[in-house]
């Protein structure tokens, strides 16, 4: 992982460490950030600048690595998955995106 990605993750972790959402702090072990502009050209992803799936964070452009709010938001989703690996993704099927409590939690960081 390059230095810019490592710094972005550590800044986001420091921001999340100020919150006590879960019993254990977010772990960066195995977490990766990928800059994948092509992904965000796909219809489902066009509305996002970042996206998380388990231990992977995808961002639209390299410049977004400097967006501490975005990276912290996506890392919060990783943290949620570390504690609720089944419930968290299923919540999007049950309540959708707009009313999802995990989205509200991530938006609060």
What do the PLM-derived regions correspond to, one by one?
Residues 56-76:
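Polar-ligand-bearing catalytic/cofactor-coordination segments
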Residues 10, 19, 73, 77, ...:
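Histidine (H) residue identity feature
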Residues 2-57, 107:
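Auxiliary, metal-adjacent structural segments of Zn-dependent hydrolase domains
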Residues 42-47, 53, 65, 69, ...:
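Post-HEXXH active-site segment of zinc metalloproteases
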Residues 1-4, 95-97:
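Active-site rim elements
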């Amino acid at each position: 992982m390059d230095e810019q990605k490592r710094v972005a993750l550590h800044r986001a972790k420091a921001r999340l460490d100020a919150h006590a959402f879960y019993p254990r702090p977010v772990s960066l072990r195995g977490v990766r950030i990928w800059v994948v502009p092509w992904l965000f050209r796909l219809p489902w992803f066009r509305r996002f600048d970042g996206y998380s799936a388990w231990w992977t964070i995808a961002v639209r452009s390299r410049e977004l690595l400097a967006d501490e709010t975005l990276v912290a938001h996506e890392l919060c989703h990783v943290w949620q998955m570390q504690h609720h690996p089944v419930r968290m993704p299923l919540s999007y099927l049950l309540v959708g995106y707009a009313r999802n409590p995990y989205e509200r939690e991530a938006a609060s960081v």
